């Protein structure tokens, strides 16, 4: 019997609903719980991050027991959904072991926190993460253990690691090293409090009302996520007409399978291969054709008017010499066909007119501020900043000032800690933006962002198609949360941009 298994056997239950949500997290020992969740005395405080950004959060929740500190931290190299190395962290407290894995992106913004790779071309094409693993095992772990901080105090632990790193973009230890520890700390903090992870996150963010999100299913993949000719990266369906998350999943799944049949009938079985995020990757070049295929599938499923469409253009991937190359995967693309920003904006306006599009992400290059502001100013739909904002408070503040977009794409590995991710969301919300929680194209089985989107109640999440286990891990976690909360739980639906 393993040490971890023996820990589980020695502990007693707190709440079967909690265990269904968080299994196999350790249960609270009898001398701590008496089979009921403990009561907490919470202090609200303003936390100052090293980045200079302030936000109000539940700084510390103290039980009737002593503080629970970290006993051990162990990092290792595992593999993500693309077969590339990534970081996994095990954190041990008196309650047992808490595990977190870090995702990785393909189309990454130049302003993201640094993902530390070994750059040894003889191993994994330079993508191994043994340096980041070493930083956790040799520095971050030992220093955190010596600091003796309570795992419930997420902000203090995250800020401790930020200061220890000492760089603006976490380039000393790597955001992937720091994030692995931060995620594991959040899970340990939830267990110490005897609550599901989403409730702990809600406490950290000061969120009083739980609202389940609309899923944005990426059903056609292009750009850097697929080996086809399609330039624009993601074509998504949003079941905004659903009345529950369960119904939204049903609608998404049915449209996904209708789409497979539509693509198969038009292009043959070979065209139904899937991309990195589980969406189909037919070898088409016309972005409008992708939208037509999705519209046909929605109609065949009987959900016209109940399902809307979103796009992630990832335009930074095909921005060349001040123009946009929609044939960028062709090394011999015709430069005369490249589009200036105003022509590309006109194309988006045509899409919005012809299709039920409610959201466009990264329509222009990450530093093409004027083009962003012009489009956001002349449309009522959601314009999402991903590469533009990279979950970074400084970039968000600039985007707010320039009125460049109206929604933040929240990716925890872009900024590197749970605390800073929450801060980014709160800053966006304060300025009237929406927030869409997001996965990365290189994912793991870790379902953390499923709890994150519920805890923050942002109203929308994108984590791929209803296909591939690393994508379904997040959607399935939200289904479990919906079941645990029970009747009366709110679903964002048509109000996904500003859930209430």
Swiss-Prot record:
It holds the Pfam family Enolase_N. Its main location: cytoplasm. CDD domains: enolase. Pathway: Carbohydrate degradation; glycolysis; pyruvate from D-glyceraldehyde 3-phosphate: step 4/5. Disruption phenotype: RNAi-mediated knockdown is lethal. Glial-specific RNAi-mediated knockdown is viable but eclosed adults present with locomotor defects. Neuronal-specific RNAi-mediated knockdown is viable with no defects. Mg(2+) is required for catalysis and for stabilizing the dimer. The active site is at residues 277, 411. Its EC number is 4.2.1.11. It is an enzyme of class 4 (lyase). Keywords: Cytoplasm, Glycolysis, Lyase, Magnesium, Metal-binding. One of its GO terms (biological process) is glycolytic process. GO terms for molecular function: magnesium ion binding; phosphopyruvate hydratase activity. Substrate binds at residues 225, 234, 361, 386, 438-441, 462. Homodimer. Enzyme of the glycolytic pathway. Glycolysis is essential in glial cells but not in neurons; neurons rely on the citric acid cycle for their energy needs, and on lactate and alanine secreted into the hemolymph by glial cells to fuel it. Belongs to the enolase family. This is Enolase. It comes from Drosophila melanogaster.
């Amino acid at each position: 019997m393993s040490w971890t298994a023996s820990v589980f056997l020695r502990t007693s239950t707190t709440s079967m609903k909690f265990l269904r949500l968080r299994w196999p997290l350790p249960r609270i020992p009898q001398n701590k719980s008496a089979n009921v969740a403990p009561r907490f005395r919470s202090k609200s405080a303003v936390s100052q991050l090293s980045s200079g950004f302030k936000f109000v959060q539940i700084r510390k929740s103290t039980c009737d027991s002593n503080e629970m500190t970290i006993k051990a931290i162990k990092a290792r190299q595992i593999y993500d959904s693309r077969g590339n190395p990534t970081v996994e962290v095990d954190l041990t407290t008196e309650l047992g072991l808490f595990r977190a894995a870090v995702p990785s992106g393909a189309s990454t913004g130049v302003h993201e926190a640094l993902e530390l790779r070994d750059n040894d071309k003889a191993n994994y094409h330079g993508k191994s993460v043994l340096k980041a693993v070493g930083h956790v095992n040799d520095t971050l772990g030992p220093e955190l253990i010596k600091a003796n901080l309570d795992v419930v105090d997420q902000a203090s632990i995250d800020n401790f690691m930020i200061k220890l790193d000492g760089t603006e973009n976490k380039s000393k230890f790597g955001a992937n090293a720091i994030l692995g520890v931060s995620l594991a700390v959040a899970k340990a903090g939830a267990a110490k409090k005897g609550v599901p992870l989403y409730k702990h996150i809600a406490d950290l963010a000061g969120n009083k009302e739980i609202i389940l999100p609309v899923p944005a299913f990426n059903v056609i993949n292009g750009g850097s996520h697929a080996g086809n000719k399609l330039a624009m990266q993601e074509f998504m369906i949003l079941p905004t007409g659903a009345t529950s998350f369960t119904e939204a999943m049903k609608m998404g799944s049915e449209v996904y399978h209708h789409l497979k049949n539509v693509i198969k009938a038009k292009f043959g079985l070979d065209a139904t291969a899937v991309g990195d995020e589980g969406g189909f990757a037919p070898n088409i070049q016309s972005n409008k054709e992708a939208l037509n295929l999705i519209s046909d599938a929605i109609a065949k499923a009987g959900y016209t008017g109940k399902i809307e469409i979103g796009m992630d253009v990832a335009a930074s991937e095909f921005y060349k010499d001040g123009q946009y190359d929609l044939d960028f995967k062709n090394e011999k693309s015709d430069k005369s066909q490249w589009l200036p920003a105003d022509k590309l904006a006109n194309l988006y306006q045509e899409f919005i007119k012809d299709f039920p599009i409610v959201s466009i992400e990264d329509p222009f290059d990450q530093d093409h501020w004027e083009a962003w502001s012009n489009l956001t100013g002349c449309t009522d739909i959601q314009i999402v900043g991903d590469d533009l904002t990279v979950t970074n408070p400084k970039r968000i503040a600039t985007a707010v000032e320039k009125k460049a977009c109206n929604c933040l794409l929240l990716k925890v590995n872009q900024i590197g800690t749970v605390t800073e991710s929450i801060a980014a969301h709160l800053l966006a919300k304060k300025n009237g933006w929406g927030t869409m929680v997001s996965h990365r194209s290189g994912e793991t089985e870790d379902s953390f962002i499923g709890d994150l989107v519920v805890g923050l109640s942002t109203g929308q999440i994108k984590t791929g198609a209803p296909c591939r286990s690393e994508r379904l891990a997040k959607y399935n976690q939200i289904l479990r949360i919906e079941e645990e909360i029970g009747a009366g739980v709110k679903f964002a639906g048509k109000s996904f941009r500003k859930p209430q």
